[in-house]
Amino acid sequence: MGELTSVEICAGAGGQALGLEQAGFRHQAAVEIDADACGTLRSNRGSEWKIIEDDVANVDGHAFHQVDLLAGGVPCPPFSIAGKQLGAGDDRDLFPQALRLVAEIAPRAVLLENVRGLGTRRFESYRCQVLARLRGLGYETWWDLVHASEHGVPQLRPRFVLVAVRQPWAGWFRWPEPLPGPAPTVGATLHDLMAAGGWPGAAAWSQRAGTIAPTIVGGSKKHGGPDLGPTRARAAWRRLGVDGLGIADDIPGPDFPAGQLPKLTVRMVARLQGFPDSWVIAGRKTAAYRQVGNAFPPPVARSLGTAIAAALCRGNVSPAAADVAHHASLA
């Protein structure tokens, strides 16, 4: 089988797209409406991915008929615990557009991620409608809650993930196993960045920040400047030795006041999300933080993409036929 192809919708800063690329998928297109996020995508993969700066509602899926994978992080406000949870009644709900594209593209597999709020009982009827539509299009479907910390990301970040695969490949799909051992800590992940400016408190800070981070919250354009979330989240950051009331322009230097908690920079937040340091984030600080904070961690996308790729690369042999062949070889 040749290389696997994909289309990414609601691509944002490219976290999911990057992880899927690392899993072996070549993106035929990355669709994103936000200008700053498109700047990020072009800065990093402008010569390799077709960047479509447009509303996903305007994208004709027939142009990408039968790519291997349709993936995306559809907007979460309709289902977010922090929001009003309007679900299908929210005009920001892009699941209908995603399902339209599934019908037009007819990919072999689908990967859509959202906040864990979508997995609550309140939205059970909505989930059933989505699954019924996908099954009507010939897909086997799975929902699961995936924790970023189980895939090498120093952050809790539970996400509700939908995977749909057509036969005969569906029988081969297995959810990725958590990585062995504990997740890296915030201190271990960021120590070199905190120390790079000569801050003498970096080593002690790293020891204090000896656990994973709470879920990073990117927020929306309706809110003001960037910060690390609501009161409860900021309290969790404070226990890690981080001032969550804003995002820093620069790393702490040698004259950083003793007893004062440092703030994270956008680059630090990107690293906590699993982005490589080489990944350029376009836009001013608030826009850059919003992109990073709302991203799907690349390592999680890589794990999911690897699992999907493994199923798709089994060819046209069904699991049942493979079992028959295996038992015949032992006879």
PLM features per residue range, with description:
Residues I9-A13:
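Class I SAM-dependent methyltransferase "Motif I" SAM/SAH-binding loop
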Residues V31-D34, E113-N114:
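Conserved acidic E/D residue at the C-terminus of a beta-strand in Rossmann-like folds
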Residues V59-L69, P77-R239, S318:
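Class I S-adenosyl-L-methionine
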Residues A35-G39:
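Short alpha-helix immediately C-terminal to the canonical SAM-binding loop
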Residues E48-D55:
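Conserved SAM-binding strand-loop segment of SAM-dependent methyltransferases
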Residues A195-A331:
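C-terminal target-recognition/interaction regions appended to catalytic cores
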